[in-house]
């Protein structure tokens, strides 16, 4: 398994950032994400919920495997392959930066792809995380 990591800071508090991103089915703040729905009659943040959503020009499905409001994090995994990305498990976490009342956000993933594709997927995932969190930053600044 290969890994990806991206982190950034936000001017808002961890609670304010988490309030926007905590909803597993409310992923429209992310880059390239369109209409989303939970397909298996679970609550949006219920472990086992499968979201079916538009990601750029394709339909993608992901399963929520962990969610904690206390720890301000959730993890999800692919339900089906995405090109040569056979599987992945991603975690999004928000932590407070106490001395400045701001937030630290990290996005990590473990993924399975052919070895010759690891660098390409690491770059792709990093770029998408950066664009998504920048879109979130813009959204929060407008609130």
Feature roles, as predicted:
Residues 4-6, 49-51, 62, 90, ...:
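Hydrophobic residues positioned within well-ordered beta-strands of beta-sheet architectures
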Residues 79-131:
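Beta-strand/loop substructures that line and gate deep hydrophobic ligand-binding cavities in soluble
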Residues 6-8, 60-66, 88-96:
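Hydrophobic/aromatic beta-strand elements that line small-molecule binding cavities or substrate pockets
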Residues 9-13, 54-56, 67, 79, ...:
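Solvent-exposed residues in well-ordered beta-strands and their adjoining turns
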Residues 25, 37-83, 131, 139-143:
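Glycine-rich portal/gate segments that line the openings of hydrophobic small-molecule binding cavities
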Residues 1-43:
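Hydrophobic ligand-binding cavity/cleft-lining segments
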Residues 11-15, 66-71, 93-104, 138, ...:
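A short, structured loop/turn motif at beta-sheet edges
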